[in-house]
Amino acid sequence: MLKLIAPTIMLLPLTWLSKKHMIWINTTTHSLIISIIPLLFFNQINNNLFSYSLSFSSDPLTTPLLMLTTWLLPLTIMASQRHLSNEPLSRKKLYLSMLISLQISLIMTFTATELIMFYIFFEATLIPTLVIITRWGNQPERLNAGTYFLFYTLVGSLPLLIALIHTHNTLGSLNILLLTLTAQELPNSWANNLMWLAYTMAFMVKMPLYGLHLWLPKAHVEAPIAGSMMLAAVLLKLGGYGMMRLMLILNPLTKHMAYPFLALSLWGMIMTSSISLRQTDLKSLIAYSSISHMALVVAAILIQTPWSFTGAVVLMIAHGLTSSLLFCLANSNYERTHSRIMILSQGLQTLLPLMALWWLLASLANLALPPTINLLGELSVLVTTFSWSNTTLLLTGSNMLITALYSLYMFTTTQWGPLTHHITNMKPSFTRENILMFMHLSPILLLSLNPDIITGFTS
């Protein structure tokens, strides 16, 4: 794992030692080279030889998420150039350092084999994200959003620490591999039920589950572009990853404890999709659509079949790329119109035809049109929820319909219609932006040719 962690850490001195005109080029090219390294983890003859150490290891569940994390750093750097154009050099370097340190803590979270180390890095991801939101957000409300984000996540994850200490005292180890091999079946008791809640609540807040989701729209709307991209694409996936890892230890409690949360996630999926239909703020709409997609992932993980785990991993990767792309497009609109309100940026297709094409492709990917991997993920989850209970087909089917409605509503409102009067001086789309959109879309389409890469450890 050092071959991935060490080059990422070396991005920090590279950032601070780069000259003014080279800072973007150096960080982008080096982070792109680093994003190739996780591809090596697929070619493992024997898992123990290459990727396992006492502290960090990778497996087919970790590797797709590592690919997503490393792929997104160069994209966030490319997306942030315009946002930081008026900042002094030291602030640019600090911003990039925050993004790099966030990536380091994410890589270590995904690869940690000790659960206490996993918990420490899981919490460490909060600090750079909080600094990015509260320092570089656009509106004064960013401080309120940062407070919501911090306290929701901390309150959710403190019981997890207590549960981990309890597990260590009873079993004598917190190594994930040892626990999965030696885990005993937990008897159904009040204490064990509370421990199950403590284990899963931290991840349900992070996902977020409907009812615990209030921090997410605030954080998304107030965050700068890189904050929104990392939050939607990778930080929400920490919740899914943690749940999948720890569900193996908590059997068979999940079977009867999961019912209320399954019902809540399926209900929340419909609710947040419906809320998206009534949004006027573009970033808020994308944030609520994220909650809706992650509710499907929660449902899939709680059902606990190999097919549902596969669907959850595919949907997490697909959603990470799609939501990041949508935030990039929303940011390109915001940089030109200086407004997130959709009605004020309508009719942009006549001025930016190529950007309208990216909008169309992103909207179609969001509503899971073939041949995107979003369709594979949604169909897998839909089939598993149907096999768990036939009545869920009504909910998941209507959710797919509402998703199509708000995706097309978002596209038509921003691209069609008459131009508004305040749009007088509009810059054309830059090559940097077009490359950025292409680099988001190409994995979504290419992974559908070989989805084995991202189907997780159950394939």
Swiss-Prot record:
Pfam families the record matches: Oxidored_q5_N, Proton_antipo_M
Residue stretches spanning the membrane: 22-42, 60-80, 94-112, 113-133, 145-165, 196-216, 224-244, 257-277, 284-303, 308-330, 351-371, 391-411, 435-455
UniProt GO MF annotations: NADH dehydrogenase (ubiquinone) activity; ubiquinone binding
Reaction catalysed by this enzyme: a ubiquinone + NADH + 5 H(+)(in) = a ubiquinol + NAD(+) + 4 H(+)(out)
Enzyme class: translocase
Enzyme Commission designation: 7.1.1.2
GO biological process entries: aerobic respiration; electron transport coupled proton transport; mitochondrial electron transport, NADH to ubiquinone; mitochondrial respiratory chain complex I assembly
GO cellular component, one term: respiratory chain complex I
Keywords: Electron transport, Membrane, Mitochondrion, Mitochondrion inner membrane, NAD, Respiratory chain, Translocase, Transmembrane, Transmembrane helix, Transport, Ubiquinone
Subcellular localization: Mitochondrion inner membrane
Quaternary organization: Core subunit of respiratory chain NADH dehydrogenase (Complex I) which is composed of 45 different subunits.
Job description of the protein: Core subunit of the mitochondrial membrane respiratory chain NADH dehydrogenase (Complex I) which catalyzes electron transfer from NADH through the respiratory chain, using ubiquinone as an electron acceptor. Essential for the catalytic activity and assembly of complex I.
Family: Belongs to the complex I subunit 4 family.
The name this protein goes by in its record: NADH-ubiquinone oxidoreductase chain 4
Gene: MT-ND4
